[in-house]
Amino acid sequence: MKLYLTAILALMISLQTSAKEPESKPKAPPAQNEPLRQELLAMFKLDQKVRIEALQALHKQGVAVGQTTSLGDPKVLLVVFKQTFSMTVIDDAHRRRLDAIIDEHGWPGKTLVGADGANAAWLIAQHADIDRAFQKKCLDKIEAMPRGEVEPQHIAYLTDRILVGQHKPQRFGTQMDGQFKPQPIEDEANVDKRRAEMGLEPLAVYQKKAKDAYEQLARGDKPAK
């Protein structure tokens, strides 16, 4: 059986290069809950570490980004099993912790945990594929936050993740297949308009950045900014 193996692993990484960044930002005030911010940042670091290790492990087996190969190769199969298991264990632990944080504090927005802490919280929800109901709970919480407390692109990414998980067309084209082609998109002719409204770059630009970044990560390079 042939599969795009990197779709199993690489697409679990959520790129930080997809949003339009303003040329300059005012200095953000300190987080109200610095210990919680640091906890979320540590979770973010571990989330990305295990995924980058998975990409690099496949790269060492000669599996390139977007390449189709056979699961009959025992070495590749072992890498897929080990890395997917590691990610699942970490993602579930992070999901349970984020759920407890939400119950205690509500959604951790920028005021509570800073912009980077809020980004980390979103990423944990984005990767909680084992529990779609939890992802929907997170999306509802994020959408209910006051303006400026969350990034609009986080809503776009999580909306698409949930829709694709339900085998429905996505709205913003954030979720790719193993060859970095978007999963089916609702009203695809207007996708760039919807992306712009959420602070996302055009789909074609995102596709190229995604593929380039994953290839660099697989080689052990740092993605270009």
Q: PLM features: what roles do these ranges have?
A:
Residues 1-4:
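Positively charged n-region of N-terminal signal peptides that target proteins for export
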Residues 8, 57, 200-201:
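A periodicity- and composition-biased signal for non-globular, repetitive helical segments
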Residues 17-19:
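Boundary at the C-terminal end of the N-terminal hydrophobic targeting segment
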Residues 22-166:
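N-terminal helix-rich structural modules
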Residues 139-201:
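An amphipathic alpha-helical core segment
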Residues 190-225:
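A cross-kingdom marker for long, charged
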